[in-house]
């Protein structure tokens, strides 16, 4: 299993290519074959799952009821936005234009490790997200981890 953590801000070129941080590359399982599935995040970001991690989600997707309106909507959205990308010889991934436009990413990108996947954010949006909570980190940590 992958375990991505940390945060880096990198440049992204006009072709959508960005380096995968070295510390995150080390967490990619050999089972992923240097392949990610990128899709739209639930916040205004792009998420990238190593192929082996994505396979576990595919099993969950297959178990959803395609006759249920919410299940069907979710499946259409996540699968329509899903693209396969590979880590190239220079340790970069190319993020599709539609994803970059959705997340408002150009020039710089903040890359965040999120256990089984990596998130790509517009740096300003990420800062807004972090600052947009009414509760402090300590309060949220006590609620989440104190269960």
Region roles according to the model:
Residues 1-9, 14-17, 23-85, 89-90, ...:
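Flexible "stalk/tail and boundary" regions
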